[in-house]
Amino acid sequence: MVGEHGSLAGRTVLDVGAGPAQFAEAFRAAGARYVAVDADPAGLTTRPAVAARGERLPVADRSVDVCFSSNVVEHVPAPWRFADELVRVTRPGGLVVVAYTNWLSPWGGHETSPWHYLGGYPAAERYGRRYGHPPKNRYGAGLWPVSVAAGLRWARGRPDAELLDARPRYLPAYARGLLRVRGLREVATWNLWLVLRRR
């Protein structure tokens, strides 16, 4: 989906929150120079890689062609500060791609779903009772509620980037219209896909 907005050949892609670098092969196959960034150095399985938090990237301003982050925004307490960092390190004309699972989607509570609809803390407590241990993605400690509306506001309000694409990531492209319907978009989107071009 990133390649829909231009060739990746010869481009430097920074994958922020890369974890096990599940997208490395696809980016490299498209000709990109791939660099993984993750807060957990033990999880960095590819090279080159940088151990760093996404909210404070040790990367120069305007230095990468594509800054990509998949399913990380909901795991940081200040999601839009995190997203601001992605814009900061992207060159003018480069792409910023942010995709995340929104809280009110069926999988917003991750492994505690669908009980997160009753609240993050009660869902985590229920999970603990059922499985005998807390969820990996604990509400308020490693999982925060992020909305589609907040992501669209952030993307549309940037003076230093133009929003090129916003759509439900796992639905057909024609489902973009869901994003115009408040309320419904929060439940039906599942995962919001945002692509911005740095000015």
Task: List PLM regions with ranges.
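S-adenosyl-L-methionine-dependent methyltransferase catalytic module, highlighting the catalytic core
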Residues: 77-85, 91, 95-195
